[in-house]
């Protein structure tokens, strides 16, 4: 049976990695993705509402997103919200749908996105290492109080380090995958 401290540490590390993965999905890469619009909200009858809750968002083959609102009166609100966002895209409204065309990113833009990806992943690594630090501190406290032996402390510290290495490696893989996605497009 796994020690409860290790289970807790693993759960926290896993959640940190999942949070970073979600954040990376929202990062612009030059490739159209409905996830890019998740944070953009429009005023829907006085309530700030994400675009994906008032419209269908589809990716087309020609590097664009098609946003088809369920109510046509939302077209201009969607268009304005996208223009006001930090995506740097110019939506076009044809009266039925809002179209977002993704231009080919420049090398400079790609490098900027890779740098941003690296920063996000580094925050995840820091979070994982902080969890390790907290657990090791807790283990030392337990040894000091006589709750566990020094041998158990060393064994658990080694297992915590193995968990840390595992999740740092996962974060590195996330970075490599995102970097490849950014640079290949």
Curated annotation (Swiss-Prot):
Question: Record keywords: Manganese included?
Answer: no
InterPro entries, alphabetized:
Ribosome_recyc_fac, Ribosome_recyc_fac_dom, RRF_sf
Which coarse location class applies to the principal site listed for this UniProt protein? cytoplasm
CDD domains tied to this protein: RRF
Q: Which GO terms describe its molecular function?
A: ribosomal large subunit binding
A GO biological-process term: translational termination
UniProt KW keywords: Cytoplasm, Protein biosynthesis
Disulfide-bonded cysteine pairs: these are none
Give me the Gene Ontology terms describing cellular component: cytoplasm
A UniProt-annotated Pfam family: RRF
Which superkingdom, per the lineage? Bacteria
- Where does it live in the cell? Cytoplasm
The Swiss-Prot or TrEMBL record describes its family as follows: Belongs to the RRF family.
Which HAMAP family does the record associate with it? RRF
User: NCBIfam families in the record, alphabetically?
Assistant: frr (TIGR00496)
Protein role:
Responsible for the release of ribosomes from messenger RNA at the termination of protein biosynthesis. May increase the efficiency of translation by recycling ribosomes from one round of translation to another.
Q: What is this protein called?
A: Ribosome-recycling factor
**What is the source species?**
Thermosipho africanus (strain TCF52B)
């Amino acid at each position: 049976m796994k020690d409860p401290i290790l289970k807790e540490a693993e759960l926290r590390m896993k959640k940190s990695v999942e949070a970073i993965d979600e954040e990376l999905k929202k990062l612009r890469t030059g490739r159209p993705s409905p996830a890019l619009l998740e944070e953009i909200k429009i005023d829907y009858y006085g309530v700030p509402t994400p675009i994906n809750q008032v419209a269908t968002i589809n990716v087309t083959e020609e590097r664009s997103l098609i946003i088809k609102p369920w109510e046509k009166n939302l077209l201009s609100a969607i268009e304005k919200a996208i223009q006001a966002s930090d995506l740097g895209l110019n939506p076009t409204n044809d009266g039925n749908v809002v179209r977002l065309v993704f231009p080919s990113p420049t090398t400079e833009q790609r490098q900027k996105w890779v740098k941003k990806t690296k920063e996000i992943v580094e925050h995840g690594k820091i979070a994982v290492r902080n969890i390790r630090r907290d657990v090791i501190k807790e283990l030392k406290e337990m040894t000091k109080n006589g709750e566990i032996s020094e041998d158990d402390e060393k064994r658990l510290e080694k297992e915590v380090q193995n968990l840390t290495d595992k999740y740092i490696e996962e974060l590195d893989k996330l970075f490599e995958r995102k970097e490849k996605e950014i640079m290949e497009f």
